Amino acid sequence: TTAWSIGSFTATQTPHQFSAGIEDGPDEHFADMEKFAAKDAHRDNLALRRIFVDNASETLRWLMSFGVEFFGPMPEPPHVKARMHNVLPNSRTYIRLLGGHATKIGVDIKYNFRAERFLVDGNRVTGIEGTGPQGVVKFRARATVLASGDFAASEALKSKYISNAVARVDAMNPTA
């Protein structure tokens, strides 16, 4: 669903913020993030939030090292400072540049493949078995990354993993 997203990325202490004269930091970012959740803030994973805000600036710079360009920072209330960076020209840039780099360094990306079982040797994942256009296939590799879209359009999964109230909210991307 990355290609359907806005492609925005919130971060502090970025070249964009410095150029705009914005003094900001991870602690302020951390404090602002719970404002999005409002009454559900108690459900937030504070350890993951801390990891995100402490690494967002470095991650944005890493993305830029692959040629990803950002516009901003833009205001994004309830954040008190502008820290939303929007990818240019759109979110497909992530797929094009990062996917291209992955292919260049030898990553074998499988599309339209339904992963059904990890192949393991002891406690180590050594591959994946699943169904693709060619039927049932096994892939073995030194590293296995399982990636998928989201479940924003699945009322059943949203109800199971979030809440019944959220399950009734229409998806931004109905085919997700």
Which residues are covered by each model-predicted region?
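Conserved N-terminal/central alpha/beta ligand/cofactor-binding core
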Residues: 3-108, 112-117, 156-165
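Hydrophobic/aromatic ligand-binding patch that stacks against planar heteroaromatic rings
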Residues: 1-2, 144
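Conserved beta-strand-loop-beta-strand element in the redox core of flavoprotein oxidoreductases
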Residues: 117-138, 144
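Gly/Ser/Thr-rich helix-start
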Residues: 1, 8, 128, 150-151
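Glycine-rich loop(s) and the adjacent beta-strand/alpha-helix scaffold that form part
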Residues: 132, 139-176
